[in-house]
Amino acid sequence: MEKIIVRGGRQLSGSVKVEGAKNAVLPVIAASILASRGTSKIYDVPKLADVYTMKEVLRNLNINVEYENGEFVVNATNPLKTEAPFEYVRKMRASFLVMGPLLARVGHARIALPGGCAIGSRPIDQHLKGFEAMGATVEIGNGFIEAKVEGRLQGTKIYLDFPSVGATENIMMAAAMAEGTTILENAAEEPEIVCLANYLNAMGAKVRGAGTGVIRIEGVDELVGAEHTVISDRIEAGTFMVAAAITGGDVFIEGAVAEHLRPLIAKMHEMGVKTIEEDNGIRVIGPDELKPVDIKTMPHPGFPTDMQSQMMALLLRANGTSVITETVFENRFMHVEEFRRMNGNIKIEGRSAIISGPCQLQGAEVTATDLRAGAALVLAGLVADGHTRVVELKHVDRGYVDLAGKLARLGADIERVVETEHELENLDAPAPLKLNTNLV
């Protein structure tokens, strides 16, 4: 079984470079379907399992795709197929983002019901509501969603019941080639939405207001291939910020954009963590003692749900009681049981987790229940006594490029291995945690 093994007790230091954003690159790749002429080149594409899945989805649609050295090249000028099969879509929820572009381009899409991390129902009704408002007919059956439109989609006004990132992206892409103007209200405001809008506009679309609650999309007749550089991954950056803070370390996160991380930075300051914003990244210096804080996840610009589990790991080390309230997903506390296996003192009350710290974490074998939970368990292992062994790395690989290797280069005692039962019997005793005494 492949595992990440962490032996706690080392203070992190040095520099780490953030990859292109997973949550930005997947919709950008989907949007490349809209280009009926020319070739699209997408830069800073991270080497992630989800990227390879999206590559196979596009190839299945008869699209030419090349991916090498962080550059994703797409030529979608061939006659398109319109079905994304379960084989690929089951692996990754973002595969559903091809529906909007296919509807806009050829008027038909048949997509298997999506998969991905099991962190809540995450319904796709808001996507379908938007397509139907633009004139599509939608049918669901036999594990597939099929949408059709006669002629072109029609621009209209759409109000989202919740500022869903995926629905905002799918509707934006569909509306880019609709007849007339679409006004999308209560839209998601994440930086990844702005990244997608910039790419669509480079292709010839007319998208205004991305990054605000109201987006206006004036439909055009044709989109062409374009070049685009993906924004840096704010969640990966945040994960390494927590790694520095939890170990009392001093780490520079190259490529981190402070404007994308304001809620996290604010909470870290409350906890006593020092951050220094520089032109090309953020330096994070962990304190000798962490203070407790309360956190409530919210759609952007609120605290990101994708940083909830990592912050829970950090709060386990804080001196006092903290409360995390999860408002975005109803089932995103599955990692709590894994933290408890490591001696984490956490109580669940409805949508809130009450963390009583500081906890002297103990190494254990734990399971990555989803993508971000896997990273959080690795973070906890950095300060746990003994060895922490994290399994189900398929989840971690969906969102992190060489997480263990990057942490090792910062000084962590960590490795990724195929472990046998015999090796489990020969693990050494833990090293003591060294505290940072050189704060600036």
Swiss-Prot record:
Main localization, broad class: cytoplasm
InterPro entries, alphabetized: Enolpyruvate_Tfrase_dom (IPR001986), Enolpyruvate_Tfrase_sf (IPR036968), MurA_subfamily (IPR050068), RNA3'P_cycl/enolpyr_Trfase_a/b (IPR013792), UDP_GlcNAc_COvinyl_MurA (IPR005750)
GO molecular function: UDP-N-acetylglucosamine 1-carboxyvinyltransferase activity
Annotated residues for binding of phosphoenolpyruvate: K22, N23
GO BP: any one term: cell division
Catalytic activities: phosphoenolpyruvate + UDP-N-acetyl-alpha-D-glucosamine = UDP-N-acetyl-3-O-(1-carboxyvinyl)-alpha-D-glucosamine + phosphate
Pathway: Cell wall biogenesis; peptidoglycan biosynthesis
Record: residues binding UDP-N-acetyl-alpha-D-glucosamine: R93, R122, P123, I124, D125, Q126, D306, V328
PTM-bearing positions, type 2-(S-cysteinyl)pyruvic acid O-phosphothioketal: C117
EC supergroup of this enzyme: transferase
Highest taxon in the source lineage: Bacteria
Catalytic residues as annotated in Swiss-Prot or TrEMBL: C117
Cellular location(s): Cytoplasm
Keywords for this protein: Cell cycle, Cell division, Cell shape, Cell wall biogenesis/degradation, Cytoplasm, Peptidoglycan synthesis, Pyruvate, Transferase
E.C. no: 2.5.1.7
An example Gene Ontology CC term for this record: cytoplasm
NCBIfam families from the UniProt entry: murA (TIGR01072), PRK09369.1 (NF006873)
UniProt-listed HAMAP family: MurA
Biological role: Cell wall formation. Adds enolpyruvyl to UDP-N-acetylglucosamine.
UniProt name for this protein: UDP-N-acetylglucosamine 1-carboxyvinyltransferase 1
